[in-house]
Swiss-Prot record:
It is found in: Secreted. InterPro entries: Pyrokinin_CS. It comes from Archimandrita tessellata (Peppered roach). Keywords: Amidation, Neuropeptide, Secreted. Myoactive. GO terms for biological process: neuropeptide signaling pathway. The modification Leucine amide is found at L17. Belongs to the pyrokinin family. Expressed in abdominal perisympathetic organs and abdominal ganglia. It comes from the Eukaryota. This is Pyrokinin-5. One of its GO terms (molecular function) is neuropeptide hormone activity. GO terms for cellular component: extracellular region.
Length: 17
């Protein structure tokens, strides 16, 4: 995982967390 994965996950996990 890296910046690329973090940005993709941020779309779903960002607003959820």
């Amino acid at each position: 995982e890296g910046a690329n994965s973090n940005e993709a996950k941020g779309m779903w996990f960002g607003p959820r967390l």
